[in-house]
């Protein structure tokens, strides 16, 4: 699902207003009502669509209404409902599954489903950019009051959130048929997949097999439009549940062009690379900040030109949002004249010397929810789609 510029601007406007008013319950609820009247739907970083609404727009039960008035230990006090995500089956009168999102009086975000409350994040802004889980580890149970103090529980949930914050989000599934071939307007032949060969890369400490085009495939020729981009599906590693699918793009640039998104779900993504001429230089993602993605519908993929400086680091010039979708960083490849062999953020794609004047990027974008539910976790395999604009 693609958003128009006006729709995206309206979503960003309401999300910014909700974030700024999250500390004032009455003002926050008023903004939620305005967003509900405008039919605002925001997408979480896990690709769940959150319909912004209050409890007047859903089928609420008695326990939920009690939570909104009284709260629950250790988050006692009035709560505000700001959204819901639902699963519908056919033309049924009620949703098959309904998860309600609540904001406590002290700013924490909680999820409610079938009488069980789950801790999700310590702030409203953090909620949109953190992996989501519904399990016994973050469930708030009725016997809590007899076990620990309020401060002990807050500390316990903060540690849980810190762990979830650094949990990479993998979009898994099978690529839809319309993305299973190279687009006809691209600069690579439609039978290009026959020329693919797998390479090994290290992704979050796990050896995965990725595929990349051969040098013969990428070699520009007179009858190819080297200024275009390629939409291409690549069959990546198999695991016990689903297949990881990746889209590669081929672009011409004098320096380096990186298309990436956050892979640790922290407040920013940081990438630095020495501009040395020798091979073997890898990225240390602890220096120059390339991407600050706050106050978006969710964190967006950034495409930007990067130039070397006297300090042998890359600076960003004229960043722009290229997509409204977000995912894990898979990597990028620099050009020969820059001299950086690869950019590693999640997975390195540059296992061989790159072609002069080109960089290779990969990123999935659109997907269905990939979320760990408390119920039937064996059925959480979801489909994902990917398109590189």
Curated annotation (Swiss-Prot):
This protein's GO CC annotations: host cell cytoplasm; host cell nucleus
Gene Ontology terms describing biological process: symbiont-mediated perturbation of host apoptosis
UniProt entry tagged with the keyword Transmembrane: no
Location of this chain's protein in the cell: Host cytoplasm; Host nucleus
Alphabetically ordered keywords of this record: Host cytoplasm, Host nucleus, Host-virus interaction, Modulation of host cell apoptosis by virus
Oligomeric form and interacting partners: Interacts with host MDM2; this interaction leads to the stabilization of host TP53.
Protein family according to the UniProt entry: Belongs to the beta-herpesvirinae UL38 protein family.
Function comment: Plays a role in the inhibition of host apoptosis to facilitate efficient viral replication. Promotes stabilization and inactivation of host TP53 through interaction with host MDM2.
The protein, known as: Apoptosis inhibitor U19
Organism whose genome encodes this protein: Human herpesvirus 6A (strain Uganda-1102) (HHV-6 variant A)
Lineage, broadest ranks: Viruses, Duplodnaviria, Heunggongvirae, Peploviricota, Herviviricetes
């Amino acid at each position: 699902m693609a958003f128009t510029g006006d729709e995206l601007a309206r979503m960003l406007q309401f999300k910014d207003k909700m974030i700024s008013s999250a500390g004032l319950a009455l003002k926050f609820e008023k903004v939620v009502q305005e967003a509900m009247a405008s039919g605002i739907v925001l997408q979480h970083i896990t690709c769940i669509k959150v319909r912004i609404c209050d409890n007047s727009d859903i089928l609420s039960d008695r326990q939920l209404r009690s939570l909104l008035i009284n709260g629950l230990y250790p988050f006692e006090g009035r709560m505000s409902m700001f959204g819901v995500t639902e699963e519908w089956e056919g033309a049924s009168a009620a949703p098959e599954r309904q998860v309600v999102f609540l904001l406590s009086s002290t700013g924490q975000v909680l999820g409610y489903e079938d009488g069980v409350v789950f801790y999700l994040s310590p702030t409203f802004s953090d909620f949109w950019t953190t992996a989501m889980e519904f399990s016994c580890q973050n469930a708030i149970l009725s016997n809590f009051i007899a076990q620990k103090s309020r401060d002990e529980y807050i500390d316990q949930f903060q540690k849980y959130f810190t762990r979830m914050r650094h949990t990479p989000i993998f979009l898994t599934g099978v690529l839809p048929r319309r993305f299973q071939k190279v687009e006809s307007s691209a600069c690579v032949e439609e039978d290009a997949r026959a020329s693919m060969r797998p390479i090994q890369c290290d992704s979050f400490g796990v050896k995965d097999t990725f595929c990349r085009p051969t040098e013969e495939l990428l070699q520009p020729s007179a009858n190819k439009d080297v200024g275009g981009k390629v939409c291409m599906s690549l069959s990546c590693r198999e695991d016990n549940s689903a297949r990881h699918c990746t889209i590669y793009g081929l672009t011409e640039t004098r320096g380096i062009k990186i298309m990436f998104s956050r892979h640790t779900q922290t407040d920013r993504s940081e990438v630095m690379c020495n501009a040395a001429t020798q091979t073997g230089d890898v990225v240390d993602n602890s220096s120059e900040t390339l991407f600050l993605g706050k106050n978006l519908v969710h964190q967006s993929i950034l495409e930007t030109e990067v130039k070397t400086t006297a300090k042998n680091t890359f600076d960003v010039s004229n960043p722009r949002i290229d997509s409204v979708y977000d995912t894990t960083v898979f990597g990028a490849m620099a050009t020969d004249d820059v001299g950086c062999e690869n950019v590693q953020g999640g997975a390195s794609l540059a296992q061989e010397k790159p072609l002069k004047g080109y960089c290779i990027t990969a990123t999935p974008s659109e997907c269905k929810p990939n979320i760990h539910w408390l119920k039937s976790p064996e059925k959480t395999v979801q489909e994902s789609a990917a398109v590189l604009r």
